[in-house]
Amino acid sequence: MRIDGVRLWALLYELDDPAHLEMPQGFDWEAARRQFDGLVARFNSAFQTTCATDRSIEDASYHAEVTVPSDATATGADLVVRVSNFGNLAVLALENPGAYDQEEFDALVHVSDLTRIFECLDEGDYILVPEEPLWAPYDGRVPASVFLQSKPSWWIRYFDYL
């Protein structure tokens, strides 16, 4: 499932709980890991490769990251999917998060790669959110002093180290 616009912002604000910074109340780490491992297996199959993963995440609002290597994509560049600890959110980036704006991303990523990624995410019940809006200044309920960086963003709130 993909979400953007008004629905995206409503969901981000709904998930924002100042009492639970790294993960929502009741977060089931083992279930999240099984869900992520299933995603990686689907990517490996869909792209006929072995994707790189980063599963050793601590002190962060995201759970893990998987990279589809450039030589397995029609795009010819790495495709990175990072999954949040919140609301089954996932984000797709070209090469590295923050490297391209939405217009560049849309122009560079091959539709066949998008189709495979969307299908794999949908099968895992992830909600794909666009990356670019997440770089907007954070104006949620968590005090700004909690964030390590001087300019907190929605990206940090749900997809980065705190």
Q: Which residues does each predicted region cover?
A:
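Non-membrane alpha-helical secondary structure
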Residues: I3-R7, A31, Q35, E58, ...
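Alpha-helical protein-protein interaction elements
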Residues: M1, T75-D78, L92, I127, ...
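Generic detector of well-ordered alpha-helical segments enriched in charged/polar residues
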Residues: W9-Y13, D37-V40, L114-D122
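Type-3 copper protein
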Residues: L92-N96, Y100
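Amphipathic, interaction-prone secondary-structure segments
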Residues: F36-A90
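Short, extreme N-terminal segment that most often corresponds to the first beta-strand
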Residues: M1-R34, W154-L162
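Short glycine-rich, low-complexity/disordered patches
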Residues: H20-D37, N44-Y62, E119-D139
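Acidic, proline/glycine-rich low-complexity IDRs
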Residues: Q102-L162
